[in-house]
């Protein structure tokens, strides 16, 4: 996980609002995504299934460098 960074927004807001999230899950999704795509605003989206979330899909948003994690949340609408 050393190669990944986290924005201040992720550290102070995302982890506060979604205290159940683990940074390890986010990095695992980026390392082995089911799907990834560019997003507006020079960001990238990654989706992956997380067994610890009862098999739900986690969407992870990074900055354009693809190593700085900015946001993450379970995505109910994602269809693999």
Locations of the language-model features?
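Ribonuclease/tRNase effector modules and their secretory precursors
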Residues: 1-80
